[in-house]
């Protein structure tokens, strides 16, 4: 089995997994870590979810897909990709840089500091 020594971090041997930040709403786990949810949700909704999450948690995992920050068109998707998936990958991309800046500002105003997973593991090993 996996061991846990930091909240949201699980490991076995040299394999490490960091849990994405999420909220339980109506018995469902809703990710609030960024990525597609940051792109698709309106900022007012994302801000509300983030504030709820930050109230009860002292860590936050942020992730962004590189294509979400690119001004270039999404790379060619396989021809078997459904129209709804194609739409989902493109929807809201123009809003991501502004939302990301707001998200970072919200985290900093709540006392959060930024780090990498590697630095967290080095810090853990030095304890």
PLM regions: where:
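Active-site-adjacent pocket scaffolds in enzyme catalytic domains
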Residues: 1-63
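C-terminal domain-boundary segment and adjacent tail
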Residues: 40-127
């Amino acid at each position: 089995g996996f061991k846990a020594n930091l909240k949201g971090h699980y490991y076995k041997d040299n394999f490490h997994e960091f849990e994405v930040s999420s909220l339980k709403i109506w018995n469902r786990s809703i990710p609030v870590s960024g990525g597609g949810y940051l792109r698709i949700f309106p900022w007012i909704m994302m801000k509300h979810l983030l504030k709820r999450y930050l109230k009860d948690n002292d860590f936050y995992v942020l992730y962004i897909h590189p294509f979400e920050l690119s001004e270039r068109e999404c790379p060619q998707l396989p021809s078997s990709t459904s129209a709804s998936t194609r739409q989902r990958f493109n929807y809201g991309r123009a809003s991501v840089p502004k939302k990301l800046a707001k998200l970072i500002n919200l985290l900093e105003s709540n006392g959060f500091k930024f780090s990498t997973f590697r630095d967290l593991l080095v810090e853990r090993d030095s304890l």
